[in-house]
């Protein structure tokens, strides 16, 4: 017992975020782990892992790290510098109400936001069902056959639609028509996408300016950005007569009242599902949608959820038609799309489940009535309202009074849209209140109330919707919140996310997404800011973004950043466009060759072809390093036309290559630029800077290295950093600087999730970030050491070390026991783990990345599980287990297996409780192994009829 005279102050820091919360192993555990690897100190391990030539000279420093409370106070102080006005700017972004049951149980629930892309279907059945609901919702509303599981934003989806049109159109034309009534950011992105590919873009009035003979496709906005609602049936028919493709960019809320694009004959529909319960968030993240006719489904980009069966014949969901994606087809892929917007798509689908078709239609009717009331008030003041028929958006010509009225509206707390030099536009939404209408009328000089007018309709009668939508029973469930809460919980219980166990996916960096980092994204000062508000209303955002850019520059050694790309793949695309525009500005527009090693991520070659570059593949040596001789030969061979090379560092094999600076020098000697893929930046922060070792541009995956959660497959952020000579060629945006080259619908991409990365930097500090990198390397080397002897670690440095991930070789098991990498992955589910990355970058292997956030206990549990799997394979080799009927081949095992008739030559205990599995709180796979072949041969991408569920249960 301590007496007062013995009292001493402790030096323990309970609120040290970096060392007490974010980094998993304790100092004592690190010492034990280092002994297993064979080192006395963490710095000794780091010195042996990183080549001295790439180490940064000065430590990463930017002030003392903050506690969680201090960081939240700083975020609050910054957020309060934003002005939250009512924004009626529209232009694809609208006020919406997020049902609290969805906000609390999905957006704020780590079971949903910490999951990974559902490549392992057995442990992803919950979000796959939610995404199937989303696809069904989109197909119903747009009247088309197949929808994907979301894209990055509406403008990107429109550009992707154009690319599909060029690919599948029978027309040989090389021009694309864009309705001038499309949103300006959509037009800008289409121009960006078309120019490097040699396609011309014609912007005009489709009634007077469209000649179908001249184009391979056309896109129409429905309703238009200024409110016009046109019937495009005749124009679409004319396009089809010449073999061209018709795309309609449609507002899904309007589609509850208006004729669908499919009924007009459209081939493709695109748009945003932001109106379905997702805040505007200064531009994102939001889930864009795309739906297509059945005939062109294989050309559609992005994830596609389909229905299949499991080993018992029960219904199961999976990602379908994956062979068309970038990780398979590389430069021949339909798109470079990798990350989508799964979390936001889930929210939108749940909004439809929450309200049902009657509720959503009622919301649309109320929005329209508000717009009509607004128009009546302005007409009473003597203004001519355009158009005559509309859904939610109207425009008035106010002449020289434009500036005065806009300022008066701001004084009333309302943002209106500046249209040209004499007009003002306004878009009404779900959140518009009567007081808002009255405030706008006052800004126009009126002094009356909403009670002075009778509600009525001004929708075009010939376009009123008569077809049904959202007919599946899931959209007609009991709307009591208790039922909604339980439905969301049931789905999340089917999934395996970071809230249950580590997700050791190589090249994915599934680290902690701390609760303190997540809290600010729902604050209205961040979530309720329209992306096109006047600059003085977003000063907090700009302060945060500028400081984050300063920190990212310090981390990378670059001189400037663009925060516009809203995924890693978009970052690659933006970086390559920057290089291309730099060459053109210097009179080197002929430089179009991009050197890419065979080990590169599939997005690299896919991104290169999107900017019109020719991919030249470079060999990789047996040890995983780039073949320097082959690289040199190809750089010399293509010197006259060399635009750039794309490399990943550390390499995709998880090793710091010694020759990286030499590779960069070679490219520069031959007139090219170096693109260093930042996917593996978690092994470099604080230890090595891309800008110091010869790279000219990189993207950073903020959803990896800087703690934005993966959301089950999105959102993400992929900002690009560049050296000073490339800074003038970074993406512009029509709503900010007016420069060309926009790559995202909003100038700062998915800005509302940037507080996550900023607060991570504030709480870690430079020293904490550096320590996190060291521990990420420690954890990977610890796993490699623990698995030594059971599995070969394929790639190591000359000192025998790996970087932040390691690749273990499971190929020998195929010959010795018949056990495949799939079997190992599915058996890990029985142990309660998501499998590591399978068969990439080497087929038949597993790439393991534990990150710095996992404790020694969790690392040991994983090692015990995968070592036990090796012993099960050994039992097959020795004849102690059947080669076909064994726990590996039958994995994953379900509760149905446990309680059903048991006729297997191994026990229930062996099946369901292998080493590593929890006995209490065990994760049970909801389905047995999913049949991938069946799913692709019998493609169903919408909710099956309710009778089929009964059939599957029989």
UniProtKB/Swiss-Prot annotation:
It is an enzyme of class 1 (oxidoreductase). Belongs to the GcvP family. The modification N6-(pyridoxal phosphate)lysine is found at residue 704. It comes from Rhizobium johnstonii (strain DSM 114642 / LMG 32736 / 3841) (Rhizobium leguminosarum bv. viciae). The glycine cleavage system is composed of four proteins: P, T, L and H. Its cofactor is pyridoxal 5'-phosphate. One of its GO terms (biological process) is glycine decarboxylation via glycine cleavage system. InterPro entries: GcvP, GDC-P_C, GDC-P_N, GDC_P, PyrdxlP-dep_Trfase, PyrdxlP-dep_Trfase_major, PyrdxlP-dep_Trfase_small. NCBIfam families: gcvP, PRK04366.1. SUPFAM superfamilies: PLP-dependent transferases. This is Glycine dehydrogenase (decarboxylating). It comes from the Bacteria. PANTHER family: GLYCINE DEHYDROGENASE (DECARBOXYLATING), MITOCHONDRIAL, GLYCINE DEHYDROGENASE, DECARBOXYLATING. The gene is gcvP. The glycine cleavage system catalyzes the degradation of glycine. The P protein binds the alpha-amino group of glycine through its pyridoxal phosphate cofactor; CO(2) is released and the remaining methylamine moiety is then transferred to the lipoamide cofactor of the H protein. GO terms for molecular function: glycine binding; glycine dehydrogenase (decarboxylating) activity; pyridoxal phosphate binding. It catalyses: N(6)-[(R)-lipoyl]-L-lysyl-[glycine-cleavage complex H protein] + glycine + H(+) = N(6)-[(R)-S(8)-aminomethyldihydrolipoyl]-L-lysyl-[glycine-cleavage complex H protein] + CO2. Keywords: Oxidoreductase, Pyridoxal phosphate. Gene3D superfamilies: Aspartate Aminotransferase, domain 1 (3.90.1150.10), Type I PLP-dependent aspartate aminotransferase-like (Major domain) (3.40.640.10). The keyword Oxidoreductase applies. One of its GO terms (cellular component) is glycine cleavage complex. Its EC number is 1.4.4.2.
């Amino acid at each position: 017992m301590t007496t007062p005279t013995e009292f001493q102050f402790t030096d323990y820091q309970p609120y040290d975020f970096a060392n007490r919360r974010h980094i998993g192993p304790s100092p004592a555990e690190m010492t034990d782990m280092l002994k297993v690897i064979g080192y006395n100190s963490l710095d000794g391990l780091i010195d042996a892992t990183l080549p001295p030539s790439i180490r940064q000279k000065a430590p990463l420093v930017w002030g003392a790290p903050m506690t969680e409370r201090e960081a939240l106070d700083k975020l609050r102080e910054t957020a309060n510098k934003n002005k939250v006005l009512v924004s009626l700017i529209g232009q694809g972004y609208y006020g919406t109400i997020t049902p609290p049951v969805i906000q609390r149980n999905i957006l704020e629930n780590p079971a949903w936001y910490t999951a990974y892309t559902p490549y392992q279907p057995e442990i992803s059945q919950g979000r796959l069902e939610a995404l199937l609901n989303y696809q069904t919702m989109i197909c119903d509303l747009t009247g088309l056959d197949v929808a994907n599981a979301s894209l990055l934003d509406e403008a990107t989806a429109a550009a992707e639609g154009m690319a599909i049109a060029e690919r599948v159109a029978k027309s040989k034309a090389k021009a694309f028509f864009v309705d001038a009534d499309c949103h300006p950011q959509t037009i800008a992105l289409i121009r960006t996408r078309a120019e490097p590919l040699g396609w011309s873009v014609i912007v005009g009035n489709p009634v007077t300016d469209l000649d179908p003979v001249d184009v391979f496709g056309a896109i129409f906005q429905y309703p238009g950005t200024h409110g016009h609602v046109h019937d495009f049936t005749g124009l679409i028919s004319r396009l089809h007569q010449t073999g061209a493709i018709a795309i309609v960019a449609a507002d899904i809320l309007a589609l509850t009242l208006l004729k669908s694009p499919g009924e007009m004959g459209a081939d493709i529909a695109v748009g945003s599902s932001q109106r379905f319960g997702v805040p505007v968030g200064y531009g994102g993240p939001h889930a864009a949608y795309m739906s297509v006719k059945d005939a062109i489904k294989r050309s559609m980009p992005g994830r596609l959820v389909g229905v299949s069966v499991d080993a018992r014949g029960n219904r199961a969901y999976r990602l379908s038609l994956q062979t068309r994606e970038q990780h398979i087809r590389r430069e021949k892929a339909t798109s470079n799309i990798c990350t989508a917007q799964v979390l936001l798509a889930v929210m939108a689908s749940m909004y439809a489940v929450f309200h049902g078709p009657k509720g959503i239609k009622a919301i649309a009717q109320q929005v329209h009535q508000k717009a009509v009331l607004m128009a009546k008030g302005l007409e009473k003041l003597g203004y001519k309202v355009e158009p005559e028929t509309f859904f939610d958006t109207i425009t008035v010509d106010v002449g020289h009074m434009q500036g005065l009225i806009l300022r008066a509206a701001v004084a009333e707390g309302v943002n209106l849209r500046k249209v040209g030099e004499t007009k003002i536009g306004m878009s009404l939404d779900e959140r518009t209140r009567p007081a808002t209408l009255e405030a706008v009328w006052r800004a126009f000089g009126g002094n009356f109330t909403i009670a002075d007018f009778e509600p009525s309709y001004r929708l075009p009668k010939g376009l009123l919707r008569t077809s049904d939508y959202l007919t599946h029973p899931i959209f007609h469930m009991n709307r009591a919140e208790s039922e909604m809460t339980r439905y969301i919980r049931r789905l999340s219980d089917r999934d395996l996310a970071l809230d249950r166990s580590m997700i050791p996916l190589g090249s994915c960096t599934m680290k902690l997404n701390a609760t303190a980092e997540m809290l600010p994204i729902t604050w209205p000062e961040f979530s309720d800011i329209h992306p096109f508000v006047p600059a003085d209303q977003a000063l907090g955002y700009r302060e945060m973004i500028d400081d984050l850019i300063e920190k990212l520059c310090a981390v990378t050694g670059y001189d400037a950043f663009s925060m516009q790309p809203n995924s890693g793949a978009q970052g690659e695309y933006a970086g390559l466009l920057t290089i291309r525009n730099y060459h053109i500005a210097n009179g080197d527009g002929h430089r179009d060759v991009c050197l890419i090693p065979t080990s590169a991520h599939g997005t690299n070659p896919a991104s290169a072809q999107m900017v019109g570059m020719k991919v030249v593949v470079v060999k990789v040596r047996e040890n995983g390093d780039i073949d320097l001789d082959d690289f040199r030969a190809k750089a010399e061979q293509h010197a006259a036309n060399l635009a750039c090379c794309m490399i990943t560092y550390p390499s995709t094999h998880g090793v710091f290559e010694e020759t990286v600076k030499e590779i960069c020098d070679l490219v520069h000697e031959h007139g090219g630029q170096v693109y260093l893929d930042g996917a593996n930046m978690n092994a470099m922060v604080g230890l090595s800077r891309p800008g110091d070792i010869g790279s000219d541009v990189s993207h950073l995956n903020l959803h990896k290295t800087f703690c934005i959660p993966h959301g089950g497959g999105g959102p993400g952020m992929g900002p690009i950093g560049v050296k000073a000579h490339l800074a003038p060629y970074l993406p512009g945006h029509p709503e900010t600087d007016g420069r060309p080259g926009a790559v995202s619908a909003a100038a700062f991409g998915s800005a509302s999730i940037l507080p996550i990365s900023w607060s991570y930097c504030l709480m870690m500090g430079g020293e904490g970030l550096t320590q996190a990198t060291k521990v990420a390397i420690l954890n990977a080397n610890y796993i490699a050491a623990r698995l030594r002897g059971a599995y070969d670690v394929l790639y190591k440095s000359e000192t025998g070390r790996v970087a932040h991930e390691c690749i273990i070789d499971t190929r020998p098991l195929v010959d010795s026991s018949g056990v495949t990498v799939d079997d190992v992955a599915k058996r890990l589910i029985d142990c309660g783990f998501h499998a590591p990355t399978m068969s990439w970058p080497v087929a038949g292997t597993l790439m393991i990345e534990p990150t710095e956030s996992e404790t020694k206990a969790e690392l040991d549990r994983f090692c015990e599980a995968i070592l036990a799997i090796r012993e099960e394979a050994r039992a097959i080799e020795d004849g102690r287990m059947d080669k076909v009927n064994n726990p590996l081949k039958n994995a994953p095992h379900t509760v149905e297996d446990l309680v059903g008739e048991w006729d297997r030559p191994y026990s229930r205990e062996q099946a369901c409780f292998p080493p590593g599995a929890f006995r209490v709180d065990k994760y049970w796979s909801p389905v047995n192994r999913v049949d991938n072949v069946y799913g692709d041969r019998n493609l169903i991408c919408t909710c099956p009829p309710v009778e089929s569920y009964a059939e599957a249960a029989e």
